[in-house]
């Protein structure tokens, strides 16, 4: 049986970052991707925002990896000529009753190490964005946008330069764990299906990470978290936008609210909303997601957007695209932290599961990759125990 030093399952932005990290550490690395191209799921269907790190509980993985990852990502974009823009973001209170929540958000961001936040009055916010309606706002200058496809191309390029190989049309079919021998036996599908043993495996399968974990014979099912999928639709603005910064309402249950984001060409889009899908079951066949945008959802978008942009014209929104967020808690539950589950948690040398890697996963991809590679390699297990 062929042996491979490291395998990454999933070629989204986090999986590619993990493969890059492992390959740059000198490990022979193979990336298994079930689709015919990299980054076709969550990594390609999001807001493409570089988050500052405002929203997450102090000392959570989301907070620490977002703040560290944001700095790493801006530097990576600069050195790899990836299109990006540090355009800034306004989080708005649209009534006096919301202003205490805005103050709490500023306090949370500062506790997380976001040191450039500015509280603005309504007049100060409108001086920056005249079309905005709010009673107060929080300016986050370090928030930005990035070409996610260009980012993934650069990550893959670095990984391949360091010796990694990407295997497309190669879904993981099954695996097995043997506590008595090192390594994890994996079997991949596709025309060139393989059976091999890997010393290090990072499960970066995103939406399907629980299914991948369930396919590993011998892995305790009790350690596989619940799996929920939250669909989010986006609508594009017809015509020019009057805004030069991102505009976010205060966060809501399940997401960050229907916000205004910009692409690198200056076109505006709005989203995502939250539509909970039927729960996928670990161990069951993967059903392909339905990414169609329901035009009937537009009415709710107009209502949400007009809270902070009352002048949004009628018939200005057109369906754009939808994405699906992997979650490990369901409707009504507080947002969960990233779950980076390594040998310190499950006792299986070399195996790391990445569960619930939703936003800010893109921002944090390089920091997540370092953490996951440390756990898979075992070189910094003490640090992982202390901070993971």
From Swiss-Prot:
Cofactor(s) listed in the protein's UniProt record: FAD
Catalytic activity annotation: (S)-2-hydroxyglutarate + A = 2-oxoglutarate + AH2
Enzyme class name? oxidoreductase
Q: What is its EC number?
A: 1.1.99.2
What is stated as this protein's family in its record? Belongs to the L2HGDH family.
* Lineage of origin: Bacteria, Pseudomonadati, Pseudomonadota, Betaproteobacteria, Candidatus Accumulibacter
Q: Write out the function statement from the record.
A: Catalyzes the dehydrogenation of L-2-hydroxyglutarate (L2HG or(S)-2-hydroxyglutarate) to 2-oxoglutarate (alpha-ketoglutarate). Also displays some oxidase activity in vitro on L-2-hydroxyglutarate with O2 as the electron acceptor, but this activity is most likely not physiological.
Q: This chain belongs to which protein, by name?
A: L-2-hydroxyglutarate dehydrogenase
Record keywords: FAD, Flavoprotein, Oxidoreductase
């Amino acid at each position: 049986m062929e042996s491979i030093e490291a395998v990454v399952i999933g070629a989204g932005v986090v999986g590619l970052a993990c493969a890059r990290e492992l390959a740059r550490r000198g490990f022979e690395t193979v990336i298994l991707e079930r689709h015919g191209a990299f980054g076709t799921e969550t990594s390609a269907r999001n807001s493409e925002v570089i988050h500052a790190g405002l929203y997450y509980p102090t000392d959570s993985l989301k907070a620490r990896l977002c703040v560290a990852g944001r700095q790493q990502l801006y530097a990576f974009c600069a050195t790899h000529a990836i299109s990006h823009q540090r355009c800034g973001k306004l989080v708005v209170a649209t009534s006096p009753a919301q202003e205490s929540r805005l103050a709490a958000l500023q306090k949370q961001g500062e506790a997380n190490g976001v040191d450039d936040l500015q509280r603005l009055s309504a007049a100060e916010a409108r001086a920056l964005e005249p079309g905005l309606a709010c009673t107060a706002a929080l300016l986050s200058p370090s928030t930005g946008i990035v070409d996610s496809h260009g980012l993934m191309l650069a990550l893959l390029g670095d990984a391949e330069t360091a010796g990694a190989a990407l295997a497309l049309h190669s879904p993981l079919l099954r695996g097995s764990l043997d506590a008595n021998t090192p390594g994890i036996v994996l079997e991949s599908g596709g025309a060139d299906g393989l059976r091999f043993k890997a010393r290090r495996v990072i499960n970066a399968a995103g939406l399907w990470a629980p299914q991948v974990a369930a396919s590993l014979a011998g892995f305790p099912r009790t350690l596989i978290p619940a799996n929920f999928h939250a669909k989010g639709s986006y609508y594009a603005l017809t015509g020019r936008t009057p805004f030069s910064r991102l505009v976010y309402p205060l966060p809501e249950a399940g997401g960050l609210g229907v916000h205004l984001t910009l692409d690198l060409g200056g076109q505006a889009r709005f989203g995502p909303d939250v539509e909970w899908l039927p729960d996928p079951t670990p161990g069951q066949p993967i059903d392909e997601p339905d990414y169609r945008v329901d035009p009937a959802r537009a009415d709710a978008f107009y209502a949400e957007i007009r809270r902070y942009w009352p002048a949004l014209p009628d018939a200005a929104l057109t369906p754009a695209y939808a994405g699906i967020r992997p979650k490990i808690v369901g409707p009504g539950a507080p947002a969960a932290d990233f779950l980076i589950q390594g040998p310190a948690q499950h006792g299986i040398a070399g195996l790391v599961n990445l569960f619930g890697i939703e936003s800010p996963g893109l921002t944090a991809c390089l920091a997540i990759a370092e953490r996951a590679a440390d756990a898979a390699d075992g070189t910094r297990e003490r640090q992982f125990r202390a901070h993971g």
